[in-house]
Amino acid sequence: MSKVFKLNSEFKPAGDQPEAIRRLEEGLEDGLAHQTLLGVTGSGKTFTVANVIADLNRPTMVLAPNKTLAAQLYGEMKEFFPDNAVEYFVSYYDYYQPEAYVPSSDTFIEKDASVNEHIEQMRLSATKALLERRDVVVVASVSAIYGLGDPDLYLKMMLHLSRGMVIDQRAILRRLAELQYTRNDQAFQRGTFRVRGEVIDIFPAESDDYALRVELFDEEVERLSIFDPLTGQIESVIPRYTIYPKTHYVTPRERILQAMEEIKDELVERKKVLLDNNKLLEEQRLSQRTQFDLEMMNELGYCSGIENYSRYLSGRGPGEAPPTLFDYLPADGLLVIDESHVTIPQIGGMYRGDRARKETLVEYGFRLPSALDNRPMKFEEFEGLAPQTIYVSATPGNYELEKSGGEVIDQVVRPTGLLDPIVEVRPVGTQVDDLLSEIRQRVAINERVLVTVLTKRMAEDLTEYLTEHGERVRYLHSDIDTVERVEIIRDLRLGKFDVLVGINLLREGLDMPEVSLVAILDADKEGFLRSERSLIQTIGRAARNLNGKAILYGDKITPSMARAIGETERRREKQQLHNEEHGIVPQGLNKKISDILELGQGLAKNKAKPRNMKGRSIVEDDPAHVDLTPQGLQKRIHQLEAQMQQHAQNLEFEEAAQVRDQLHQVRELFIAAS
């Protein structure tokens, strides 16, 4: 079989990586359904996974617990596989308020949502890649377990065009309208088409930098070409092309008509139940809302909140699992669950919260009972659909350990030779004064400190106390949004302040090589924030520094502390032994400080077409952009789009293309920020 994945890296597997790669690949080839990779902080887990993907040549989905880590993984995978389809699939809502009813105050809250067009385009691109290619890595958030259009209906709706095909212009335009494309002869943008004589230009919904030109002659497709929608320059002539629907939720007309009949039948049954229970108001409300939706579906082919009828539109039975991104993944696909100790419980919790809200809507006549089937997957359904799975975590949960039969693949030795931090336990009585003296020692040699406490009040008091004693301190709390949080972490690394105080925000996925001390106050207070996994994750924040040290303040050693200290010492001994055997001298990490915010640079460089000019890199030339909030970046995107269109109208195509290259980069920054 020809090799489709091409791994691009200047590094070769080192430390525990070669053994981990070998064992993972053997397990997958032997048909093991579940494997757990215990990879410590800084051991190159993503690189190990990338090697497994490249060697086994299988389409892969990587699940991350949140958008920040998904963006980070997407950036890393994009660098490892520049010539393959690395896709990004997260929730496309910038803002989402689901419809809800509060019976106590008789308040109905309408659904309100703001969709991010760029992320919608990336989601469409992800499903297209899974349907068309084998060399695909989709990095997804837990959004992947939510209902998506049925892949069978989606495939049925595609429009295939090929050179020499006999089809008249009206038939093409009718099919485009069914795919929910709109005609716009003035503003040519994603999801639209324009007609000029016998030429139809189509801007595919999943594309952001190319369009399709269909030239007809005497009811026959004479030529198909890919062109730059900005400059109009033809880039290639192609023999065939497939146009995908504008949305995942597109449905054939006959299916809509059939669904409408089924909805009417359910409405009659439900009205009878409500009237029998003397719920006249609910019966009237349900009848009015459903009739309005049916009218809209009949006239337009869709209605607001059409997802509530998804059971009928996809032809499923009551209680059946909704189609999701997993239905698009080939049968021999591979699933990698990153930070599995966080992601797995998240998957389990999604269904229950959604169900409680919908039951109230059904009970009070806002929705038909079939709306309960518009839901995320249940955990059991996820287990049934998941292909061969690799769980990746520094602290695997009980579920992962049980599923992989207690067999854990250790990736403890880092390629850099860095050791896990030294762990000390000190008494609580003098913890604040002791911490102050430790901070001063670190500040004197230009190193940083993380401090984790139990409550918001303690964090505020400690921040105030340390500030009064002349230390440069910031406090990270739950009210701070993702972008500001990333900026605070970057400022800490840059040395704008020396100490960061937090509660539960100093855990997974934060790379800060400058941090040499992690202080855990009140470590002996057994609970979620001081569990074995939380302690190991927090101690791991100092594992990227040559002088890494963790101080646990506690008057007694709890079972969680004992296990966390024992595990850290086990890892440290293994790392030391490996270094001695191979004559390795530990090297400090020298990671670029702007890494997480430069998500889009590699992508923009890959996507930008070779031109006879130097497209200015916004990220490199204008650091102000890195500080922008999602709102600021969105505004900048609109400004650049307007600027680009203006250049195109003035026939200044080189300048327009230059602005377009900048636009790519700002969009990718926006993904990291959103």
UniProtKB/Swiss-Prot annotation:
UniProt domain Helicase C-terminal: residue ranges: 431-597
Ranges for domain Helicase ATP-binding: 26-183
UVR domain mapped to chain residues: 634-669
Cited PROSITE patterns: HELICASE_ATP_BIND_1 (PS51192), HELICASE_CTER (PS51194), UVR (PS50151)
Binding site for ATP: G39, V40, T41, G42, S43, G44, K45, T46
Compartments where located: Cytoplasm
Keyword list, A-Z: ATP-binding, Cytoplasm, DNA damage, DNA excision, DNA repair, Excision nuclease, Helicase, Hydrolase, Nucleotide-binding, SOS response
Domain of life: Bacteria
Primary role: The UvrABC repair system catalyzes the recognition and processing of DNA lesions. A damage recognition complex composed of 2 UvrA and 2 UvrB subunits scans DNA for abnormalities. Upon binding of the UvrA(2)B(2) complex to a putative damaged site, the DNA wraps around one UvrB monomer. DNA wrap is dependent on ATP binding by UvrB and probably causes local melting of the DNA helix, facilitating insertion of UvrB beta-hairpin between the DNA strands. Then UvrB probes one DNA strand for the presence of a lesion.
Family: Belongs to the UvrB family.
HAMAP family: UvrB
UniProt free text on domains: The beta-hairpin motif is involved in DNA binding.
Protein name: UvrABC system protein B
